[in-house]
């Protein structure tokens, strides 16, 4: 047991360092983002391979989608940066809650992967469900945003269904919503496949682990909808006549589209992640 734990810690350090360095080289993360990314990834992988695969699937798929169609996104996104270049605040906004949960879990389990089973441990089931929901939300929101910006469909504000310009906070498209569900599906599938190799679930408990896939799919969509609802109501969107873009800050040249200036994009992301994490945790307690 001690040997496998030490091996996992070593793997976590080497793999996280390699991924963070590569991400910095390819401009997926800036310097501060790469440093924070290394810490967060190392914690997840050291806590359990299932948790490690969740953050890695989220990171790699979101990074690829961020770079897809960059020329078009450059004309839409006010904060566009070549390659994405997420900083430490963005990394933390998309990983802080899950990092806290996996640290609690590894403290309880000693790094042993456990099945989702409330009869054995409701606490472990609830906390693990929260981690799954966290990354289903993160992946769903990212896929939805990145694919939605490239959609040929007309974005509509989620609160009024009024047609709005691309880049408006709280706007949704059919393609974006389907992408969110697909993103959640990928998270659930990755967790389940790795779990088959790392857990000793048996009987009905083993079969029930497959329910993670539809749960994560639903939470990918749900998390994206929550993010859009918050974006449309507590995050300001306006059209700048000078930059010819939708922006998130008031100015003399900006005409309001929607939302109050209460939270910025990182705040909206963190709030939607927290709500989806709690929702998934409760769902897992009832289902498993």
Placement of each model-derived feature along the sequence:
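Hydrophobic alpha-helical transmembrane segments
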Residues: 1-288
